Each structure stands twice: as structure tokens, then as C-alpha cells.
Amino acid sequence: MRNKKVELLAPAGNAEAFYGAVHAGADAIYLGGNRFGARAYAENFSEDELVDCIRYAHLLGRKVYLTVNTLVKESEFSELYEYLMPYYRAGLDGVIIQDMGVFAFIRDAFPQMELHGSTQMTITGEYGAEFLQKQGACRVVPARELSLEAVSYTHLTLPTNSRV
């Protein structure tokens, strides 16, 4: 039987939205830092702000997920490692990822980190979702183009430890 507990996951584009989501009852908050996020021109969080958010959320039993949802060039992987390390040390709960190479890199470099497949990975069905789960993803955010019926079908076909 599937776990029926729902995680209320809220976005936060700035500190005010983060604290608002935490105090409104979100179980988890996802946000972008100042690098490797699709919202490059958004306000986003500085390194210190993000570390403070992680620590604050954990004091209240909440989780924080960081978006790393851009394509990363081969020459940028050492920068990605340095970028993620302070958040990993602070206890970042997971990373929402677009690029399969980034997915494999983070899986290997940060083995305790939860990996989530971003909607930008364009997973459209059970084969893609199952493949990603076998690679270590604990959550798959399906492609935006899918109908609710297609998402429900994919959810029902996956192993019980997967989340869609």
C-alpha cells in the first residue's frame, strides 16, 4: 500500500516568501540560490541567506530543497561542487535537478542528498520515471504538458518508495 502522507511543498523566491511558507504550514520549501538555477534574473538567495533558511527550517522540522535546474557545462562541475558544499554541510534536504549529468554528479559527490527530477527533465511516463527512480531519484516531477490522468497512471505504476 502506498504512503498517503502528502508533503506540502511551497516555492520561495525570496526570504519573505520563505518565512511566509514556513509559518503558513509548508512541510518543505524549494528555492533557488545565486547559481545554477533557471530563475537567473530573479532575486534568489545568497549563500548566507540560504544556509540560514536551511537551519531555520530544520529547527521547525521542515525541509529545504534547492533547484539546480540548468544545464551545466563540463567545465562547471568543480564550481557546482563548491557551490553545493556549504548547503550540504548545513543539511540541505534535497536538490531538484534538470540535467542527467548533474544528477549523476550530485548522486556520486553527495551520496546522502535526496535527488528529485525536475519538471524540466520532461519525464512523460512510467518508463522515464522508473528509470530515474533506479538512478536514485526519490521524487519525479512530471513534465508540465501531461494531463492529470497521465500523471496519476505514472504514479500508480511506480514502486511504493517513489513519489510523483
Question: Which residues fall in each region the model found?
Answer:
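Glycine-rich, proline-tolerant flexible connector loops at the mouths of alpha/beta enzymes
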Residues: Y30-E49, V68-E74
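Active-site-adjacent beta->alpha loops and helix N-cap segments on the catalytic face
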Residues: Y41-V51, M100-A109, E145-Y153
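Hydrophobic faces of well-ordered beta-strands that scaffold small-molecule active sites
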Residues: L8-P11, I29-L31, V64-V68, V95-I97, ...
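Conserved small/polar residues in nucleotide/adenosyl-binding loops
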Residues: T154-T160
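Alpha-helix-loop-beta-strand connector modules within alpha/beta enzyme cores
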Residues: E47-Y65, I106-Q112, L156
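N-terminal basic/disordered segments at the start of proteins
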Residues: R2, E7-A28
